[in-house]
Amino acid sequence: VKSLSSLRISGAEVLPIVEGGKGISVSNGESSGAWAAAGGVGTFSGVNADSYDENGNIIPQIYYGKTRRQRHEELIAYAIRGGISQARIAHDMAGGRGRLHMNVLWEMAATEQILHGILEGAKGLIHGVTCGAGMPYRIAEISAHYGLYYYPIVSSARAFSALWKRAYQKFSDLLGGVVYE
């Protein structure tokens, strides 16, 4: 078996093995922490991530608001708490090895607010943000605000060209890579 050579990803030498960041709690702090602990890049989903109580039990996402707006605000709070929770779990499991990324969907509701909330609450725990599902123009600016690398997911060279011209060229030093799907 031939050994893998490391690559510089999100500011560190790691194995070129990257967890994809599957959504809705499939890729979580445990899976991403394990990938990072093995020397690769772990990616947890920041979409509706689970949060836990003091006993380690999942906190059910129950909405008590009487209006759509109130329930939306509850959803945002759950998303931020869950993302921070998964980042902490991943960071603890990684033990300082590898890199940790968060994956979000640009077109989900309140993406920017949720991103800021998670990244503010998980400072120093996350090294990069992967983002697709739309044209994530502001992912570069938001990631740069927190000193993080960003990895847009694009569907074509034309889409990337538009993103580059409109936003990414201003933050090219933190563009960690581009995911094509």
Where are each of the predicted segments found?
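Active-site entrance/lid segments in N-terminal catalytic domains of soluble metabolic enzymes
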Residues: 1-181
